[in-house]
Amino acid sequence: GSYLPRQGSFLIQPKDTFFGLTGPNVVRSVLGEDVSADELGGPEVHSQSGVTDFIVEDEIAALRKGRELLRYLPDNNSVMAPHYPTSDPIDRDTKDIDILLRNAFNSPTGFNTPIDFYIIIQQLCDHGDFLEIQPSRARNTVTALGRMGGNVIGFVANNSAVSSGQIDI
């Protein structure tokens, strides 16, 4: 396991990187098991366990992802998250949401009809832009940051389009 990196608020891990308390050589010598660094502490392992929030291509992409993330976060706990003026009208029509919900609620399965919440989040956010946190983990739950009217909002949505939205973690 990896404990110290997860003590931060968000963790961005480039592909082809490893972090952990011990490496493959220690596992081999102590347990006699032959595992690779990637299997032990690579980005795929950590994204599935919830340790890594974002997997990116390389260190440059990690810096870009960090900058993208910082656009949604306040400088400290005593101030609000940054407001960005938007040209996206707050009162615009969201016909796709209306169609999606009408089809779901008018279907024979009613409230049990799967709804893809990515569509709803995209329709609600300014210009359809949002940042999903831990996109590789728990596809049945969407956790994201976005903006409405230039103000930062957070989403935690049960995505019934995946595994009927059942919480399985």
What are the language-model segments listed below?
Residues 1-78:
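Conserved catalytic cores of soluble enzyme domains
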Residues 23-24, 43-50, 91-102, 154-158:
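Short acidic (Asp/Glu) and glycine-rich catalytic loops that position anionic groups and cofactors
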Residues 32-35, 50-57, 104-115, 160-167:
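Short, exposed beta-strand "edge-strand" segments with a Pro/Gly-rich flavor and a Y/T-containing core
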Residues 26-27, 33-34, 68-69, 84, ...:
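Charge-rich, low-complexity amphipathic helices
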Residues 111-169:
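Non-catalytic terminal/interface segments that mediate subunit docking, oligomerization
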Residues 16-18, 23-28, 32, 37, ...:
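Generic secondary-structure boundary/loop-capping signal
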Residues 57-121:
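Terminal amphipathic helices with adjacent charged low-complexity linkers/tails
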